Design a protein with these regions (language model features):
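Exposed, interaction-prone extracellular/peripheral surfaces
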Residues: 2-48, 56, 61-69, 75, ...
């Protein structure tokens, strides 16, 4: 579902096709993703912290008393510190990337320069670039099986460019057990319906990371006066002559929906993070780096 605009400039059918048409900008999205990934890698290298791109989340400092056979001498030679390769990351993992491309994701208010869908695509390509340098298998449900190739980012871009899906979520039944699953969506639906879609993942012993893509207008509901609201997926319309009167109730329901999803994720040992389209993607990527390295799946694999 998308929020309102003062005047509806395009018919519903054109709204539904907007996000798919934006994929013509895929070369620009690839360029942006590479720039973000390279900036992060350069920053990690400059700070001399473990996880500098080639070994994303893979190393930690050596502690006295630990076996020297686990020291990674190549990584340690880069600076004055000594690093161990984490045992759990010696086994390649599969990370499933799930960017929502449904009609509501095309929404972009005047408070942002990019739609939710394009924000999700750039995030997907950036994560793929970083994960590929880590040697992880990367996959997209219904589009690309787990793979680890040098051109995986380009393959993902091509797959997304030639794919249009009205559904917010893919077929999760194809996801392999003991994987990481990163789901990028606006999650604008009844929470119980979303949870029903996600239930299949709870049986697969995966660790899911839900990234809620949000437009600034969806957070604050800045609308006033006569406003028409359109749901681009159901085509349902609502006209308000005094939109500001809806703000309090809207914000209450909007944040209650989010909190219910946060609580569900917490019970599963999953993570939930909000990524607004007017903010840099780096914060979201740092969040994923921390939560994936601290996840129960990560710790179980160390046993």
């Amino acid at each position: 579902m998308a929020l309102g605009k003062k005047v509806l400039q395009k018919p519903p059918l054109s709204l539904a096709n907007e996000l798919h048409k934006d994929t013509g900008k895929m070369p620009y999205f690839l360029l942006q993703a590479r720039h973000i990934a390279n900036t992060l890698i350069t920053g990690w290298h400059r700070q001399r912290k473990s996880g500098n791109g080639e070994n994303f989340w893979q190393f930690r400092p050596y502690m006295e008393g630990e076996s020297i056979t686990r020291i990674d001498w190549r990584r340690s030679a880069r600076d004055e510190n000594t690093y161990l390769r984490e045992h759990e990351w010696q086994t390649t993992q599969t990370v499933w990337l799930c960017p929502d491309q449904s009609a509501s994701m095309h929404y972009c208010s005047r408070f942002s320069k990019i739609s939710k869908g394009n924000h999700a695509i750039i995030l997907t390509l950036t994560l793929a670039s970083l994960l590929a340098r880590s040697g992880e298998h990367i996959a997209i449900p219904n589009l690309m099986s787990p793979t680890m190739t040098s051109n995986v980012v380009e393959r993902i871009a091509f797959a997304l460019e030639n794919h249009s899906d009205e559904n917010s979520f893919p077929d999760f039944s194809t996801i392999t057990r003991f994987s990481h699953v990163i789901i990028m969506s606006d999650f604008l639906d009844y929470p119980e319906k979303i949870i029903q879609h996600l239930t299949v993942l709870t049986t697969k012993q995966v660790t899911a990371h839900l990234i809620e893509i949000s437009d600034p207008a969806e957070e604050s509901f800045p609308y006033t006066g006569h406003t028409e609201f359109l749901d681009p997926e159901t085509k349902e319309k609502h006209v308000s002559t005094k939109a500001e009167d809806l703000r309090k109730s809207y914000c209450k329901l909007y944040h209650a929906r989010r909190q219910e999803l946060v609580n569900f994720c917490a019970r599963q040992g999953w993570s939930y993070h909000v990524s607004t389209t007017d903010q840099p993607l780096t914060e979201t990527i740092f969040h994923l780096a921390n939560t994936m390295s601290d996840s129960p799946l990560h710790k179980r694999r160390a046993l």
